[in-house]
Amino acid sequence: MSASVFNRCWSKVILETLSRQGVSHFCIAPGSRSTPLTLEAIRLQENGRGTCHAHFDERSLGFFALGIAKASKKPVAVIVTSGTATANLYPAIIEARQTDVPLIILTADRPPELLECGANQAILQQNMFAQYPIASINLPRPSQNYSAQWLISVLDQACFRQKQGGVIHINVPFAEPLYNANNDEIDLHPWLSNIQSWLTQNKNWIQHQEQHTEVITHKYWDQWRTKKGIIIVGRLPSEQAMGIAEWADNMGWIMITDIQSHVKPTLPYADIWLANQTVRKKLLQAEIVIQFGSGFIGKRINQFLAEFKGEYWIIENNQKAVDPYHHAHTRFNAKPHHWLRAHPPMRKKPWLLEPLALAKFCADFIKQRVGSNLNEASLAHNIELLLPKSNSVLFLGNSLFVRLADALSQPSANYPIYTNRGASGIDGLLATAAGIAVGSEQTLVAMIGDTSTLYDLNSFALFKQLNQPAIIFVINNNGGAIFDMLPVDIAVKEKYYRMSHYLEFSHIAAMFDLKYARPYTWADLATVLKQAYSRRETTVIEIKVNPNDGSNIYKDLIDKIGHALIGV
């Protein structure tokens, strides 16, 4: 029997196993060595059991898969050939690991006899992603010496470990030949005879029974709930954010939220008003802080957490450490709604009124300071006006704009907001946004900086695969305006940090056959958005702003609010 047939049998078992573990999207980069895996993924698609996506750039492909997995909340498989194609996936793997997004990376490899001997496109791929995967499976070359049952079991066990997210790396060496295998030869191969019954059923080989761990009420909760408390809410999936705001309100406790929290802020603009030292000192009088989620964007929220010395509780539904300030704390590995149910509130009046007064003052002051012109700060402040009321998702890129949005906006509760704030890189943001559109099957609005866009231009090609409206805002402040915040010499800052490019994006949109608009006023933007939302295609909207406007407004707001005298 030809090696090409058995390579396909081996690949069939791998992909059938992953399909039963919830994988329905296969992101494929072109390459010869990965042919057995690619052809079996295509077979699943032809049988209505999966969707294949192809892209020529592995780095973008990895982030595209990341976006699909974020939005669908299901594992996504990535298939690449051997060599440096595999290394290009590393940034997306890092981001997935940092944010517990389930990716399954399938790297085709040369067989062992072709490694370390000068063979073409052969690098050391085993365990190449170090500690970032939760499981690294280095398969042997396909051989009938290993049973199909063994192969399924190895993969099933790894997928069980992935139930709380993370990356699985499966390295699959194939010897030639790789082509000309007949489907009947594959399906009737005797090696598959012991799993024929399983192949006809849509169930996992190993049936894991779910274990429901009840959250135990803290033994001193009756005492702690009478104290002065603060709720801090970081990055949370929307389904885990329900009930937190009502619970905090009943307790009369201060609640500070991140834009990634999916919780409607009762005290918006926290990253601005926390600059006020008078109010911050009063907040530090709290006796307990309870943290839901993690990954806070705002600098002043992080500074407050670093200063706080009282009782500290963290509710996080995984085993990771999420306290960069190393408080002595109580940790609950639980979903927020389970924890809330086990810790009923005690209705009380608010213990501190100054934050409410300061938040109201901020609202008026911010509106006045950002003005009516179309700029970074006004976009962030009015972001809710740009979004459809339903059936849509928002993706925020990194650098300056995500900080402005976190500090100046008031998003609706449970509006789906996605970010790449695990490692907070500017790579792969367009690709991630495209993946989120695919995974959510909803209208996409993405806000991405100019430097980030230049970093990921190849990913514009992915938007041609979409079948729904997608709006990509490119915020063009002529380089890295986030670095205006740094205390660096102006000439050095311009050359080595900001790196002004003096580019605009109309020709790039045209190259990828995407719609393009450059509005100058809010009225222009309203017209552009109305047209863009009516089309089942992608529109690039370039917002060209003065380089320093966003950072200057941000710094000015922090300075003015920081010194404001607020009475209640």
Swiss-Prot record:
Q: Which gene codes for it?
A: menD
According to its UniProt record, the EC number is 2.2.1.9
List the SUPFAM superfamilies: Thiamin diphosphate-binding fold (THDP-binding)
* Cofactor entry: Mg(2+); Mn(2+); thiamine diphosphate
Associated pathway: Quinol/quinone metabolism; 1,4-dihydroxy-2-naphthoate biosynthesis; 1,4-dihydroxy-2-naphthoate from chorismate: step 2/7; Quinol/quinone metabolism; menaquinone biosynthesis
Q: Which domain of life is it from?
A: Bacteria
Pfam family, any one: TPP_enzyme_M_2
What is the purpose of this protein? Catalyzes the thiamine diphosphate-dependent decarboxylation of 2-oxoglutarate and the subsequent addition of the resulting succinic semialdehyde-thiamine pyrophosphate anion to isochorismate to yield 2-succinyl-5-enolpyruvyl-6-hydroxy-3-cyclohexene-1-carboxylate (SEPHCHC).
Which family does the entry's similarity section mention?
Answer: Belongs to the TPP enzyme family. MenD subfamily.
Q: Output the GO biological process annotations, alphabetical, semicolon-separated.
A: menaquinone biosynthetic process
What broad class of enzyme is this?
Answer: transferase
Listed GO MF terms: 2-succinyl-5-enolpyruvyl-6-hydroxy-3-cyclohexene-1-carboxylic-acid synthase activity; magnesium ion binding; manganese ion binding; thiamine pyrophosphate binding
Q: What is this protein called?
A: 2-succinyl-5-enolpyruvyl-6-hydroxy-3-cyclohexene-1-carboxylate synthase
Q: Which reaction does it catalyse?
A: isochorismate + 2-oxoglutarate + H(+) = 5-enolpyruvoyl-6-hydroxy-2-succinyl-cyclohex-3-ene-1-carboxylate + CO2
Question: What does the subunit section of this Swiss-Prot or TrEMBL entry state?
Answer: Homodimer.
What the entry lists under InterPro entries is as follows: MenaQ_synth_MenD, MenD_middle, THDP-binding, Thiamin_PyroP_enz_TPP-bd_dom, TPP_enzyme_TPP-bd
The signal sequence is none
Keywords, sorted A to Z: Magnesium, Manganese, Menaquinone biosynthesis, Metal-binding, Thiamine pyrophosphate, Transferase
Has UniProt tagged this entry with the keyword NAD? no
Q: How is the cofactor bound?
A: Binds 1 thiamine pyrophosphate per subunit.
